Amino acid sequence: VRSSEEWSRLGGGLIVVLALGTVLAVMAPRVLGLAAGPEVEIITALKRTEADGLSVMLPGVSTPLTGRTHRFARITVRLEPGGQRAEALATLDFNGKLGKTEISSLGVERVPFVQKDGVWAPEGSAAPRLAAVVAALEFRRRALEAGDTSALNRLVGRDAGVEGTQLDAVLALGRRRYQSQAWYIRMERDEAVVTERWRLEGVLPSRPVDEQGERSLSLLRDGDEFFFSPTLM
């Protein structure tokens, strides 16, 4: 039977071990980063999100873009002068949803990184380009459902337009409901090509309407945003 003094020493030793473990957990990323260089630390940070999960809040949208599975591959890192900022270029294979909309995406992603307190971390989202495309798609869906032509005009590129018979058919409906059931996205360097599976419900003076289908959409990058081109439909 151990004496109270022996139990006290064991308890003190356990406290020391736990304290060391906490210090190592905090300091390990910094130590590894110094030993391996920023490129390895940035790549490790991106790959870590595959286990931690990916959830991105979009501006003006209460529901986050949430991934079920995602994988970064072919990652390269570009360090900026000064050594405090960098950019990771990668391919991102993503499957998830935004609200009730299923999303599958494959293609190019560019992730800005900054060094904070000796640790490299994404400056914002770990999938900023995917988030920008999904935000544009969701804003379009909302504007179509609301019949908001001013909002629709803000979503198109400089040389694009919002006119067309398909758009007129949507806006002609009363009690309109426009659902994007799925978006299948292919991300290129400066462009995104999307197949949308949609459902449109509403009423005309002569009859109710309940239609479903698929359409192809194209978005072009302008800075950090994506705009529809040549048309919204």
Where are the language model's segments positioned?
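Short beta-strand edge/turn micro-motifs at domain boundaries
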Residues: 2-4, 87, 99-131, 191-193, ...
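Short solvent-exposed beta->alpha transition segments
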Residues: 39-96, 149-197, 204-207
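Aromatic-capped interface at the extracytoplasmic side
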Residues: 28-37
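Short solvent-exposed loop/turn micro-motifs enriched in small/polar/acidic residues
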Residues: 70, 104-106, 135, 178, ...
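Surface-exposed beta-loop interaction hotspot
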Residues: 121-149
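A short local loop/turn or secondary-structure capping micro-motif enriched for an aromatic residue
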Residues: 96-98, 128-134, 201-204
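Hydrophobic membrane-insertion alpha-helices, especially the h-region
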Residues: 11-29
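Short, low-complexity patches enriched in S/T/P/G
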Residues: 2-12
